[in-house]
Amino acid sequence: MKTIKSLFTSTKPELLVTGFVFTEGPLWHPDDILYVSDVDAQVHYKVRLEQKVITEVIRDGSGGANGAVFDKDGCLVICEQDARRVVRYEPDGSITVLVDKYGDKRLNRSNDIILHPDGSLYFTDPDKKGLEESDKELGFASIFRINLDGDLVLLAKDMNHPNGLGFSVDGKTLYVSNSRPDPHLHAYSVDNSGMLNDSRIVAEMPYGNLGELSGVPDGLKLDAEGNIYVTGPGGIWVWDKYEEFLGVIELPELPANIGWGGTDNCTMFVTARTSVYTFKMTRPGIPKQF
């Protein structure tokens, strides 16, 4: 029988770098770099992995940069939750706004983003927490897709606070964490056109059930075997490919998001409040972008 410990070479996290305010959006690049956003400080950084030091500020005044992914052309794409938009960092250093409105209404607070195998981008736009009443325009929380032609498609609006998201190994299921007010792991089937159907709750994730650490479901990733990892109350919650709960790996700080990296894609990077931690895994993560 598979255990949660069999997925980690060690369940003790290794501190990579610290000194931030609120870390998010870990994204690995093969040039020995980890991109990390400090959401509250409004700064986006490069961390040099071998030296375990911050080597460069790539954007100061980052719009609350949160989830990040490389697009089909290898450009960095960021959800800027405070600026309420999704942007792409161009090779020349300029920034292109991919989307900031659905129709004539501004997005809520774009949160996390992933790349579909066809090159389109799926992202969550959760509820309006943090917005003044007068700034609320959409009236619902959403999961969107940015098509290759730039069109924005509404995929789902039946969750209260969709947050992290990830595709199953076969691409036929999209898993999404719901943060509040009913924290849980959610799932949709993905049809051949990339639309979402068969909305269902996989598992409830109650608030702060692990001693002094609280928190909500947040970042989400899967590995090549189909195991599901969600940052949540007290640590990283794990389910196997059959959606059976395996347990929780605790961290010194409350985690917010997860990223895969390393040449074998077997390193898990975890952003957790003031720090970034790593685990070495026994299965590679998906997708492998490089």
Residue ranges and their predicted role:
Residues 55-60, 96-100, 154-157, 196-204, ...:
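Beta-propeller fold detector
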Residues 37, 79, 124, 177, ...:
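Residue-level marker for isolated small/hydroxyl-bearing positions within beta-strands
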Residues 1-11, 41, 137, 195-196, ...:
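Blade/loop signatures of beta-propeller domains
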Residues 12, 17-33, 60-80, 85, ...:
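Beta-rich, blade/repeat-based domains predominating
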Residues 188-195, 281-288:
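Short loop/turn segments immediately following beta-strands, especially the blade-tip
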Residues 39-40, 81-82, 128-140, 179-183, ...:
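Short, solvent-exposed loop/turn segments at conserved positions within beta-propeller repeat blades
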Residues 43-45, 85-87, 141-144, 184-186, ...:
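A short loop-to-beta-strand structural motif that recurs across blades of beta-propeller domains
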